[in-house]
Amino acid sequence: MNSAVDTICARATAVGIGAIAVVRISGPEAISIVSKCFSKSLSKVDSHTVHFGIFKSANGVALDEVLVTVFHHGKSFTGEESIEISCHGSPYVQQQILDALVITGCRMANPGEFTQRAFLNGKMDLSQAEAVADLIAAQSKKAHRIALNQLKGNLSSDLKVLREELISFASLIELELDFSEEDVEFADRSQLKDLVSKVLETVNKLSSSFALGNALKSGVPVAIVGAPNTGKSTLLNQLLGEDRAIVSDEAGTTRDVIEETLNIDGILFRLIDTAGIRETNQNIEAMGIERSQQKIKEASIVLCLADASDVNNLSETQTWSSKLTKTHPDKEIILLSNKSDLLKNDVEEGISLSAKEGIGIDALKSEMVKAVVGEMDLENDTIIANARHHEALIKTAEALEKANTGLHDGTTGDFIAMDIRQAMFHLGSITGDISTDDLLGNIFSKFCIGK
């Protein structure tokens, strides 16, 4: 497909005051339009060259000293003739440059239009285009790595292999349908069963990685829970390395939920210090406890904090932790025995620590990372972090399950072929091999303008 024939422009850097800013132009008239506002002609310069000069308004008034970088057709991010203007970071100067470009023949770009043109011009597939937005929004090392791997085409390569296998499968089934009257079987059913099972296993593996990918992308919610005065706020402060929560000997000091972020080994954790859970007659504290219960439901990891110096509290917390493990199998429940510095011997269950003295904090951090990553290799494994991709993989798996059932039940080839085509369609929707205008509009509208 070819992109729109007009030439677009927008800020490529964030709005606001800075040392420099970049204005991006892309389209068939990019070089011609900028040349009209620049102090020298750019029509014969080489691609990937940088030129210093004065940028002028449509009336010829000098606006700024700028650097202009030229990219020829087929050699730019969008695949089109493109220019990037590096100017001083004054919002006024940026706007004056944009105004001059619009008067001279540019149109202001829509959100994500530069990346959309890159997709339409075959510079990247749809999953790579979405990775651009994820790369910009990445808040941690691991989220950055997942987005970068996707941008490099790791996911695209995996899906290409799967689609090629399904195409090979479908072609044999379709060939049988063409010769149905001759009762010829081109495809060995046992081999087809093995192929579908193999593809289905890979699709399910990719799909199951979404929980990890989404957590790494959005931050892993961690609820710190326990009875009043067990040291939850002290633990939060120790993990953060600062006094964020009020610490007091008085039970019920924390009456609301406190949320902070913590980066451990490149993984972003969203720590939630909750109100101590106990029976209370005070309305404000009761509201805090109710919110604590809700945060437990929302968390991926629950840190159950016990006061190891209090035998009754330790026993109750151990029992409660075991119940949470059974009632919330989708969550990682970690039992923590706090105030271990007051004991002669370590507690056998859970992690022994002293939030006050910082003892056991490194062990806790390691356990939190292990709870998130498990056996996954974040550097090399393909991990799904996009909800649209996850939904498409689920639909792919459903279609393959139907095909697999049909093969085992002796279903006729036309129904099996239909299921395989559905699986291919959903896989293709991830990379954009199969897409609709509505889908593209929804995806690229979420990008920032200038990207």
Where is each model-derived feature located?
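Inter-motif core of Ras-like GTPase G domains
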Residues: 285-309
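A glycine-rich (often HGG/GG-containing) alpha/beta subdomain
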Residues: 1-145, 149, 153, 327, ...
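Switch I (G2) and immediately adjacent beta-strands of P-loop GTPase domains
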Residues: 52-72, 252-280, 301
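C-terminal-of-GTPase-core extension/linker across diverse P-loop GTPases
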Residues: 2-11, 15, 141-263, 280-282, ...
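Acidic-residue sensor for enzyme active/binding pockets
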Residues: 65, 80-84, 113, 128-130, ...
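Conserved G/P- and acidic residue-centered "switch" motifs that form tight phosphate/ATP-binding loops
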Residues: 122, 229, 273
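Generic enzyme active-site microenvironment
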Residues: 271, 305, 336
